[in-house]
A protein has these predicted regions:
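Acidic, metal-coordinating helix/loop segments flanking the phosphotransfer/catalytic sites
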Residues: 4-5, 18-39, 103
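C-terminal output helix
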Residues: 97-110, 116-122
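His-Asp phosphorelay/catalytic-motif detector in bacterial-type signaling
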Residues: 12-13, 35-39, 63-68
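Receiver (REC) domain active-site loop signature in two-component systems and cognate sites
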Residues: 46-49
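Conserved active-site segment of CheY-like receiver
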Residues: 71-76, 96
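Active-site residues of response regulator receiver
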Residues: 42-43, 73
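Short, glycine/charged-rich "phosphate-handling" switch motifs in NTP-dependent
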Residues: 90
Length: 122
């Protein structure tokens, strides 16, 4: 099952956009500030701009600071994981990813994101 299909099944708002590297991802976000993704799935190992550099850039922009980011990577480097969490990621999974755990993680993150973006009135 593809990531796009999983997001569709979970009713994640906005469509899935696939960028080949961090530079393309930053360009997409900058060009689409009025329709930001509900979640970003990111790899550490990407050409031109790696995932850590991408995270640093988006976390320094007020429009992108709170976007939930999940790392899906082959990197088993502990420093990558620590630095990613220090930069505010919502989840980290090493490939190959267990489908059920992935779905569960995305469900929890999207639920939390929706609650934080649209708090219930008391």
């Amino acid at each position: 099952m593809t990531i796009e299909r999983v997001l569709e099944q979970l009713r994640v708002p906005n469509r899935a956009i696939f960028c080949t590297d961090g530079v393309e991802g930053v360009e997409y976000l900058n060009e689409n500030r009025t329709m930001l993704p509900a979640i970003i799935l990111l790899d550490i190992n990407m050409p031109r701009m790696n995932g850590i550099e991408f995270l640093r850039l988006i976390r320094n922009d007020n429009d992108f600071k709170r976007l939930p980011v999940v790392i899906l990577t082959t990197s088993t480097e502990e420093r990558d994981k620590i630095e990613s969490f220090e930069l505010g990621i919502s989840g980290y999974m090493v490939k190959p990813v267990d489908y059920d755990k992935f779905v569960e993680m995305i469900q929890v993150i999207i639920k939390y994101w929706r609650l934080s973006e649209f708090p219930q009135e008391e």
